Amino acid sequence: MDENKKRALAAALGQIEKQFGKGSVMRMGDRVVEPVEAIPTGSLMLDIALGIGGLPKGRVVEIYGPESSGKTTLTLQAIAECQKMGGTAAFIDAEHALDPIYAAKLGVNVDDLLLSQPDTGEQALEIADMLVRSGSVDILVIDSVAALTPKAEIEGEMGDQLPGLQARLMSQALRKLTGNIKRSNTLVIFINQLRMKIGVMMPGQSPETTTGGNALKFYASVRLDIRRIGAIKKGDEIIGNQTKIKVVKNKLAPPFKQVITEILYGEGISREGELIDMGVDAKLVEKAGAWYSYGEERIGQGKDNARGYLRDNPTVAAKLEAELREKFQPAEAAREEGDDEGEDE
């Protein structure tokens, strides 16, 4: 760059700093690039698939899927992990459906959890913004986007047609929230529901879409698609769900990773079950018939007994986890038409 241009740039930067404050514009090389802080999800498999060890702080995350697929369970486990690290958590329950007893079973300290059950979508998002701006909340969950009902809809008649109202509300809120989220380094998780698109579909295109318009798809740094794919049985009794979690969008690491984990009723994501499955995949745990072995030790006949052994022997589980963090590679998920929808990269 010639001298005249350098002087002009220095003058412009000086004027910008004077008007907008120091650090308004900076050279990338002047600042040390620090790794993104992450909050673990409670699922070792998912933490590895996300590439940064969990969900990123200072970013927006969207978790969506069909009903009873484990969306709220996953967010409550992330809250529990955040509280274990000494963080403060807030839960905006727009669905008015949070069960504190279930949350406590998942490890959430419900006495310290900040809870809001707002009347309107505007109130929910305003409370979220105020909590984020306080800079003292580490993780904030909004459950769910579909339940953020605009004030005009609540005050109107049952049959009133108000097209695009919720989408406009989300778009406006996210424009306002994003900068504050980054500055306060808060992880904000939006839980979302699925709806079916009405009308003619292109071949190969998914008929499913999320509620609240396209704004959240653009602003989210991570999008997770969570689905129940089977039942876990103990004899004839169903004790949980087999769940597939797909990283549909990831701005911080390669996306399209996929994991299959277990969510047990009343317990949440089975850490021990994950260690066994991952250990078998990574050839650290040997499976011969119904028996599972780790090193020289037989750890159980059948998965349920092996799970119990790891639960009773935390040092063995910790050793296996440390080895798996180095070796385990999550599966690549098949890309679908709808996966790129709303991505800006």
From Swiss-Prot:
Annotated segments matching region Disordered: 326-345
InterPro entries, sorted: AAA+_ATPase (IPR003593), DNA_recomb/repair_RecA (IPR013765), DNA_recomb/repair_RecA_CS (IPR020584), P-loop_NTPase (IPR027417), RecA-like_C (IPR049261), RecA-like_N (IPR049428), RecA_ATP-bd (IPR020588), RecA_C_sf (IPR023400)
Protein keywords: ATP-binding, Cytoplasm, DNA damage, DNA recombination, DNA repair, DNA-binding, Nucleotide-binding, SOS response
GO molecular function: ATP binding; ATP hydrolysis activity; ATP-dependent DNA damage sensor activity; damaged DNA binding; single-stranded DNA binding
Localisation: Cytoplasm
Record keyword Signal present: no
Pfam family of the protein (one): RecA_C
Source domain of life: Bacteria
A Gene Ontology BP annotation from the UniProt entry: SOS response
Sequence ranges of Basic and acidic residues compositional bias: 326-336
GO CC, any one term: cytosol
Residues annotated as binding ATP: 65-72
Family: Belongs to the RecA family.
NCBIfam families linked to this entry: tigrfam_recA
Function: Can catalyze the hydrolysis of ATP in the presence of single-stranded DNA, the ATP-dependent uptake of single-stranded DNA by duplex DNA, and the ATP-dependent hybridization of homologous single-stranded DNAs. It interacts with LexA causing its activation and leading to its autocatalytic cleavage.
Name of the protein this chain belongs to: Protein RecA
Organism: Stenotrophomonas maltophilia (strain K279a)
Upper lineage: Bacteria, Pseudomonadati, Pseudomonadota, Gammaproteobacteria, Lysobacterales
Gene label: recA
